[in-house]
């Protein structure tokens, strides 16, 4: 991704409905993918609709890359906002081919994407061979890729994506996710991505907003926010951290790669990325155990020195969630309270983190 990330999104809204109130005040990056994450009913889609101008009753302020879309005296209607919107369902026109749907998107834009740029989007999303097909001739994943291309055809300054994979089965999600990762790398505009799926957030997001009961309870860089212990929602088995890492070495005999991050190196399964590839690793708290001294004669490949930062109760009276610092990187470990007591864990305690599984997610 290129371009200046300093041009930000200022979003402040208040909306009162019977039984629900949205009250948010956010400053978001002007580039990259911001995930709006939370349980159903937390206000994610309502916030997205306010940003799109679909909730006229919402009071507030919206500035996108220096442009005022809404304030006390001005309200730019949806059709005049330079944005693209991708819904859970592809919502393509059934009587038009994929090409016709893209051309429709270009016609409704005051400043449509240039033909050469549209060709780039078509290639990026891998839909060139699908352009002459009608929506009923496409799989769910193919329809959604065409819908994303149509949203980009209007040359938006902001792309809104409301759980674009929610209607797809697992196989179709795995089909579409690599294309979304390619968009993440190539797009020069901010993307707001609504999801309640931790794996999607781990793969795609740069910035994370945690929503609950109509409010933004946390907002910050993905890695830092996931490692917070004070989030109002628990991710259950999915709690963990995401770390930026680089493929530093390869062990072809055992089909492994060594990932360098700001805290050391980790062995992971080789997925074919070249040396120097910048990606992400995801480490779940359930896959981290602790010891007071190095352990030998174990099947665990990754053991790193760490320092205890803090700990909190973890939803069940038997469990505790421990935050660690490995070099400059955060790490989470889920332990039984009995184990934490036996290890005499306290802030500042030096331990060894044994990491049973490392997943490359980008």
From Swiss-Prot:
Superkingdom, natural source: Bacteria
Keywords: ATP-binding, Cell inner membrane, Cell membrane, Membrane, Molybdenum, Nucleotide-binding, Translocase, Transport
ABC transporter domain span: 4-238
Enzyme Commission number(s): 7.3.2.5
SMART domains tied to this protein: AAA
Ranges of residues in domain Mop: 297-362
Binding residue positions for ATP: 38-45
Assigned GO CC terms: plasma membrane
A Pfam family recorded for this sequence: TOBE
Membrane topology summary: Peripheral membrane protein
Cellular localisation: Cell inner membrane
Broad class of where this protein is predominantly found: membrane
First-level EC class: translocase
Catalytic function, reaction form: molybdate(out) + ATP + H2O = molybdate(in) + ADP + phosphate + H(+)
Entry GO MF terms: ABC-type molybdate transporter activity; ATP binding; ATP hydrolysis activity
Gene3D superfamilies: 2.40.50.100, P-loop containing nucleotide triphosphate hydrolases (3.40.50.300)
Alphabetized SUPFAM superfamilies for the sequence: MOP-like, P-loop containing nucleoside triphosphate hydrolases
Record InterPro entries: AAA+_ATPase, ABC_transporter-like_ATP-bd, ABC_transporter-like_CS, Mo/tungstate-bd_C_term_dom, ModC_ABC_ATP-bd, Molybdenum_import_ModC, Mop_domain, P-loop_NTPase
Described purpose of this protein according to its UniProt entry: Part of the ABC transporter complex ModABC involved in molybdenum import. Responsible for energy coupling to the transport system.
Recorded family membership: Belongs to the ABC transporter superfamily. Molybdate importer (TC 3.A.1.8) family.
Subunit relationships: The complex is composed of two ATP-binding proteins (ModC), two transmembrane proteins (ModB) and a solute-binding protein (ModA).
The protein's name in its UniProt record: Molybdenum import ATP-binding protein ModC
Organism: Thiobacillus denitrificans (strain ATCC 25259 / T1)
């Amino acid at each position: 991704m290129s371009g200046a990330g300093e041009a930000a999104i200022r979003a402040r809204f208040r909306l009162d409905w019977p039984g629900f109130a949205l009250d948010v005040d956010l400053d978001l990056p002007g580039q990259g993918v911001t995930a709006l994450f939370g349980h159903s009913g937390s206000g994610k889609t309502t916030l997205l609709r306010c940003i799109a101008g679909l909730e006229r009753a919402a009071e507030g302020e919206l500035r996108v890359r220096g442009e005022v879309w809404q304030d006390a005296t001005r309200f730019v209607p949806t059709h005049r906002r330079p944005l693209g919107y991708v819904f859970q369902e592809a919502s393509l026109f059934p009587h038009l081919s994929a090409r016709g749907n893209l051309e429709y998107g270009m016609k409704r834009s005051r400043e449509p994407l240039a033909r050469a740029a549209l060709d780039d989007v078509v290639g990026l999303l891998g839909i060139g061979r699908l352009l002459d097909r009608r929506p009923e001739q496409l799989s769910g994943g193919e329809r959604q890729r065409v819908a994303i291309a149509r949203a980009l055809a209007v040359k938006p300054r902001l792309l809104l994506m409301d759980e674009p994979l929610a209607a797809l089965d697992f196989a179709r999600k795995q089909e579409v996710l690599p294309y979304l990762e390619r968009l993440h790398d190539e797009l020069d505009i901010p993307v707001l991505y609504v999801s309640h799926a931790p794996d999607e957030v781990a793969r795609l997001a740069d910035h994370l907003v945690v929503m609950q009961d109509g409010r933004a309870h946390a907002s910050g860089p993905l890695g830092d926010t996931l490692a917070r212990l004070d989030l109002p929602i628990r991710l259950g088995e999915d709690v963990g951290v995401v770390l930026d890492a680089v493929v530093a070495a390869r062990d072809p005999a055992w089909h492994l790669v060594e990932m360098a991050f700001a805290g050391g190196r980790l062995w992971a399964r080789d997925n074919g990325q070249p040396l120097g590839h910048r990606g992400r690793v995801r480490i779940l708290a359930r896959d981290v155990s602790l010891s007071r001294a190095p352990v030998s004669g174990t099947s665990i490949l990754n053991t790193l020195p760490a320092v205890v930062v803090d700990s909190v109760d973890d939803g069940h009276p038997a469990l505790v969630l421990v935050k660690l610092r490995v070099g400059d990187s955060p790490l989470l470990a889920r332990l039984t309270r009995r184990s934490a007591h036996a290890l005499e864990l306290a802030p500042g305690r030096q331990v060894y983190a044994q990491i049973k599984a490392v997943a490359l997610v980008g």
